[in-house]
Amino acid sequence: MSTLVSLPTAAPAPDYQSIDRPLNFSNAAAAKVRELIQEEGNAELALRVYIQGGGCSGFQYGFEFDENRAEDDLAVATDGVTLLVDPLSLQYLMGAEVDYTESLTGAQFVIRNPNAKTTCGCGSSFSV
């Protein structure tokens, strides 16, 4: 797993292991991830959500499938599907919801992040 070096120094992340559910992984998102994992044919995969520098607002969200879980990753399970977040990204995602939406304009994973001060029009980047 790579270290994200472009992020500014932030306050230490809260002890997320003592928080009941620091990040919400919706049923709709879990169902879509399950479908994509079945298409990949690898039941060991989990969806990793991460933050990296970039985008029009300073930070951007990233999604990838990962079969490796680091010891300090947060793992959130919904309906038997796992979402992974590294501690550095988690400090920017505390209290957020990872959802999946479908509309006339398309389908996408969406992050509703209460820590974001501003977001870009497409919702892929934010500032804190």
UniProtKB/Swiss-Prot annotation:
GO cellular component: cytosol
Record carries keyword Transport: no
Single GO term (MF): 4 iron, 4 sulfur cluster binding
Parts of the chain that traverse the membrane: none
Annotated residues for binding of iron-sulfur cluster: 56, 120, 122
Entry keywords, A to Z: Iron, Iron-sulfur, Metal-binding
Co-factor(s): iron-sulfur cluster
Superkingdom as given in the UniProt entry: Bacteria
Co-factor: note: Binds 1 iron-sulfur cluster per subunit.
InterPro entries in UniProt: FeS_biogenesis, FeS_cluster_insertion, FeS_cluster_insertion_CS, FeS_cluster_insertion_RrpA, HesB-like_dom_sf
HAMAP family assigned: Fe_S_insert_ErpA
Oligomer and partners: Homodimer.
Family: Belongs to the HesB/IscA family.
Protein name, UniProt field: Iron-sulfur cluster insertion protein ErpA
Organism: Xanthomonas campestris pv. campestris (strain ATCC 33913 / DSM 3586 / NCPPB 528 / LMG 568 / P 25)
